[in-house]
Structures are given as structure tokens and as C-alpha cells.
Amino acid sequence: MTPAHLLILAAVCVSPLGASSSRPMPLNLYQFKNMIQCTVPSRSWWDFADYGCYCGRGGSGTPVDDLDRCCQVHDHCYNEAEKISGCWPYSKTYSYECSQGTLTCKGGNNACAAAVCDCDRLAAICFAGAPYNNNNYNIDLKARCQ
């Protein structure tokens, strides 16, 4: 092994990516996170990952409030995007722009990317307009989401 190969191997092993114990975030979720941070800079995007009955993985029952309803609509939007041939919203990346809290899905996205971008954009805008109730974070799904 040449010194150059050893240097590259060492860089990968000690880099933040190589040393990370957490799984990498799918690129689409990373983009959605950034959209949320664009429209709601005052809150951590993580606050929306386990909120109500629909924000986070899955979803069932009646949304607990307007913010949870934003997530329910987002879930349905992804379901519609999945009807586009070969479209998997959770891994589909897209081109967009955030400028002073305004999100724009760029032209040039294919049909799937355009649909997913619009789903994420509308959800992030909805989050910005809905009140956040701390009592609806990390709720008992079995008790409240029937």
C-alpha cells in the first residue's frame, strides 16, 4: 500500500463521517429538515419528528391539532407522489431554494422530484403557520391516536 493510500484510509477512518456512530440521514429527509429550518428557524427541526399522531414515522387516528394535521397532509402528499412511476419520496432529492424564509421548488425537477419538493415545501409552510403545543410532543400514540 502506498503512502497516498494510507493517507486516504486514515482520513476516512478519523473523519466525522467515518467516526460517526449514527446512521446517515437520507438526503430527502435532510432537504426536508432544511426546509423546516428555513420557515421555522426558531425551533429545532427535531421538534417535529415526534409530534402528535402523524409527525414522524407512520400515522393513524385523528390529528391532535393543526400542526399534526400538517403532517397528516404531508403523509397523504407522499402517498400521492408514490403513484408516479418509480417515485420513492423518502429518498428522492430535488432542487429548491430558501431565501429569507421563502421556499421555492426550482424548475428542472422531474415529475417525482417536483411532487416531493412541493409536498415538503407545503408542509414546511404549514408548520410555520401552526402553533406548537409542547404537550403534543412524544405523546402516547396507543392512547391518543386511535
Curated annotation (Swiss-Prot):
In which tissues has expression of this protein been reported? Expressed by the venom gland.
Alphabetical UniProt keywords: Calcium, Disulfide bond, Hydrolase, Lipid degradation, Lipid metabolism, Metal-binding, Secreted, Signal
Question: Which residues of the precursor form the propeptide?
Answer: 22-27
Residues of the active site:
74, 120
Question: Which cysteines link up through disulfide bonds?
Answer: 38-98, 53-145, 55-71, 70-126, 77-119, 87-112, 105-117
The UniProt similarity line reads: Belongs to the phospholipase A2 family. Group I subfamily. D49 sub-subfamily.
What's the cofactor? Ca(2+)
One cellular component term from this protein's GO annotations in UniProt? extracellular region
User: Pfam families from the entry?
Assistant: Phospholip_A2_1 (PF00068)
Does Metal-binding appear among the keywords?
A: yes
Instruction: Read off the SMART domains from this record.
Output: PA2c
Gene3D superfamilies, A to Z:
Phospholipase A2 domain (1.20.90.10)
Q: What is the recorded function of this protein according to its Swiss-Prot or TrEMBL entry?
A: PLA2 catalyzes the calcium-dependent hydrolysis of the 2-acyl groups in 3-sn-phosphoglycerides.
Provide a Gene Ontology MF annotation, just one: calcium ion binding
User: What is the protein's given name?
Assistant: Acidic phospholipase A2 2
Could you say which residues bind Ca(2+) here?
54, 56, 58, 75
- Record has Signal as a keyword: yes
Identify the main location.
secreted
> Which residues does UniProt assign to the signal peptide?
1-21
For this protein, the Enzyme Commission number is 3.1.1.4
What biological process terms from GO does the record include?
arachidonate secretion; fatty acid biosynthetic process; lipid catabolic process; phospholipid metabolic process; positive regulation of fibroblast proliferation
Reactions that this protein is recorded to catalyse: a 1,2-diacyl-sn-glycero-3-phosphocholine + H2O = a 1-acyl-sn-glycero-3-phosphocholine + a fatty acid + H(+)
